[in-house]
């Protein structure tokens, strides 16, 4: 199989050693910065590099993961609220409930690329506290809903404000971590989503005891408590969340990194693919380039059909599915916790393996296969109420498989788009379709009238995974592998004579020296 190292073959003239490779840079300013990077590579070797990574991990991962935990709770707590009488109190039918969930994804998906562009322009220290506090406030207002129309309006507003967290966090991680490190970090971050599934059940179980307090139903308490926690988290972002590394001025860095650590943190990502780097200046042309790139649409297919459709449908329907196995509404909330804990562990493990092997495609296909096996077993066993244990086991597999694919799809995208502005736009665009298409479909395919067998829901999930995700993933992998082979046969010296360093940098991943991560 082809090597998936994304570092390009380096030049063979005006040389400077970097390990076993020989490098060339022709522009004087580039030489200075790249030589500085090579020097820092030697300074930050072994224990000092691990120390830097620990600092980055401790600053970024807990903060972003907790924000995503709250985002996932505030987005999916409607499934828990349903069991606490939300539909009856607001006079909603099951169909209206599904439609309200679907409407959320329209504003959510349409706002994702816009939010990521804003993040790229103003930075995370300003943008993230704003959007987190905004959706926390809207979540608390959900506790005051008194009609179906009011609930729909609130869900539309929630979609606008929550949209920036998921794609934004992926982009932030891609600005601090190299392609060989990012899969594990995205998996840890995404694990907060599955952890939310676990905590959501526990929190809902605890909030259930508040039913009737101060004349409020339990579902109102659920939205109020989770919304207040989110507002607090948004305010904490002002102090905990760092800016992008290139936004810090020389000599005016940050207290948690030394000036040298901050400089290396920025340069090691900038030159992760060799001496030719993309521009860090925001340009609208890079956004347009992302919209025209074939890679963006292949990753959209994966995120839409293999990720969002089965994941969202499982998230909103799991409490009801577990209740259909014979558990009470309150007990069903708790029983949703173990599958999500298992899914979190599998998610992080797959992310780590994908980083160590740099085989993103194989890890994605493995995750799809695991989720597919779980859905098929569950589809079969729901027809046999006498074996609820097998159905419950299948939920473990489905939750783990469909959760594990998401961060690897994000890492695969980030690793193969070098320009930061184009990468931000591409991540936002692929999540737009994933959220609008996947969320709107996923929230409507498990129809209450078809419970507990859900023939449409299970059948659609299986078909979406195979036809919409596994086949496009294979085509995408094949095309990139073919291009890597073609570029491997080119004459490096001829490329250097034909193009300047600046021209190669402008090409980004289209440069003949770039190799795609497979």
From Swiss-Prot:
Region spans: Disordered: 1-24
Record keywords: Cell membrane, Glycoprotein, Membrane, Transmembrane, Transmembrane helix, Transport
Organism expressing this protein natively: Penicillium expansum
Membrane-topology descriptor: Multi-pass membrane protein
TM region positions: 99-119, 122-142, 156-176, 187-207, 221-241, 298-318, 334-354, 362-382, 392-412, 427-447, 455-475
Biased composition (Polar residues): 1-13
UniProt superkingdom: Eukaryota
Glycosylation sites: 416
Compartment(s): Cell membrane
The encoding gene: cnsO
UniProt similarity note: Belongs to the major facilitator superfamily.
A cellular component annotation (GO) from this entry: plasma membrane
Name of the protein: MFS-type transporter cnsO
Gene3D superfamilies: MFS general substrate transporter like domains
Function (record text): MFS-type transporter; part of the gene cluster that mediates the biosynthesis of communesins, a prominent class of indole alkaloids with great potential as pharmaceuticals. With the MFS transporter cnsL, is most likely responsible for cummunesins secretion and thereby may contribute to intrinsic resistance.
Family matches, as SUPFAM superfamilies: MFS general substrate transporter (SSF103473)
GO molecular function: transmembrane transporter activity
InterPro entries listed in its UniProt record: MFS, MFS_dom, MFS_trans_sf
A Pfam family of this chain: MFS_1
Keyword Glycoprotein included in the entry's annotation: yes
